[in-house]
């Protein structure tokens, strides 16, 4: 039995192999005595898996147990992490999930576990993640608004722009690029006893985990420790627009908020808008395909979850009715969210832990 398992996911990382090797190298050198690293490769075809395996075999400390899992297909974040979940030590108490473009701080796993030990209802946590090698923040935990926008708390801000960042806070969900979960709680609370639903593939997975945990009576939190540096979207950049819109459409359909009464019109407007714009530009045809795939994904997820997700059972960002009209129906949403920083104080019930 090990106390913690770290699942590290790779897919076609040859184009940024230096960062991927730094990432797995940091995962092998954590200041923690009792853990294993499960390396999952999502059927990479660019030779990156072979480079990574050679690096690990040469650099692995003798005290760290390593398992390699090679998928027969690209299963995305959700399916790949689930493969690692199935391969981990079945008795492990905590499981960390780590992207191949994130370099972890040596003390982070131990410090995250120390916080989790203090509350038996704490199911998932993440720390302070910086954007690449800059001083800008990628995530201090993650939020969902009541008009179905998700993102990183303090995202793209600097520490002095984020009051409360030095204290732990409950958040809507933990950051999936590097988060820690209580394995037993996930087995009890999540459909199929696994941390993710395979069909989500990419995006939505960490948000769905947090929302389900809150709806089941558990908690997710941001812990104020420097946990890592994320060179974001190096793997997903070619498909992020498609999967991002797909995930957002599914989230709208699945998640009940105080704006749920307007969902039918909201979705109809999107559907019609993409159809009309598709007549003029191909990119909107692709967007419409993504929208329809998100609609179908929501049907699958709803049947697997088995109950309605209520945002009000989690901390969330409350949007005013005027803001909802301006930012969504007058198409100002993208401009607003690129220019604003969501802080912990903006979440409902922003109490420290």
Where are the regions a protein language model picked out?
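Active-site-adjacent helix/loop segment of glycosyltransferases
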Residues: 7, 219-303, 307-320
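Acidic/His-rich active-site region of diverse nucleotide-sugar glycosyltransferases
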Residues: 70, 79, 110-195, 199, ...
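A conserved acidic beta->alpha catalytic loop
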Residues: 15, 23, 41-52, 73
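Catalytic donor-sugar/metal-binding loop of nucleotide-sugar-dependent glycosyltransferases
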Residues: 192-201, 207-228
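Short beta-strand-to-loop acidic/aromatic patch adjacent to the donor-nucleotide binding site
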Residues: 91-103
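Short, acidic, metal-binding catalytic loop of nucleotide-sugar glycosyltransferases
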Residues: 23-34
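Acidic donor-binding/catalytic loop of UDP-sugar-dependent glycosyltransferases
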Residues: 47, 102-115
């Amino acid at each position: 039995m090990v106390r913690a398992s770290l699942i590290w996911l790779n897919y076609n990382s040859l184009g940024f192999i230096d960062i991927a090797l730094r990432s797995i190298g940091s995962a092998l050198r954590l200041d923690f005595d009792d853990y294993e690293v499960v390396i999952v490769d999502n059927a990479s075809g660019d030779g990156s898996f072979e480079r990574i395996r050679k690096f690990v075999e040469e650099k692995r400390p003798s005290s760290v147990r390593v398992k390699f899992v090679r998928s027969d297909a690209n299963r995305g974040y959700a399916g790949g992490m689930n493969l690692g979940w199935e391969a981990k030590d079945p008795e492990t108490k905590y499981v960390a999930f780590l992207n191949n473009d994130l370099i972890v701080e040596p003390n982070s796993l131990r410090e995250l576990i120390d916080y989790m030990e203090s509350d038996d209802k704490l199911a998932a946590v993440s720390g302070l993640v910086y954007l690449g090698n800059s001083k800008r923040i990628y995530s201090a935990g993650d939020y969902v608004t009541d008009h179905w926008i998700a993102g990183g708390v303090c995202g793209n801000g600097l520490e002095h722009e984020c009051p409360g960042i030095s204290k732990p806070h409950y958040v809507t969900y933990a950051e999936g690029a590097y988060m820690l979960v209580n394995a037993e709680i996930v087995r009890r609370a999540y459909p199929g006893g696994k941390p993710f639903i395979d069909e989500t593939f990419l995006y939505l997975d960490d948000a769905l985990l947090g929302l389900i945990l809150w709806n089941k009576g558990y908690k997710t939190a941001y812990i104020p420790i420097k946990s890592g540096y994320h060179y974001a979207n190096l793997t997903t950049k070619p498909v992020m627009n498609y999967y991002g819109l797909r995930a957002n459409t599914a989230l709208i359909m699945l998640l009940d908020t105080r704006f749920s009464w307007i969902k039918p019109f909201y979705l109809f407007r999107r559907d019609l808008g993409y159809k009309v714009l598709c007549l003029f530009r191909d990119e909107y045809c692709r967007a419409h395909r993504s929208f329809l795939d998100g609609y179908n994904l929501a049907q699958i997820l709803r049947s697997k979850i088995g109950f309605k997700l209520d945002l009000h059972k989690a901390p969330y960002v409350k949007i005013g009715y005027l803001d909802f009209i301006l930012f969504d129906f007058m198409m100002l949403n993208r401009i607003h969210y690129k220019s604003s920083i969501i802080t912990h104080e903006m979440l409902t019930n922003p109490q420290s832990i």
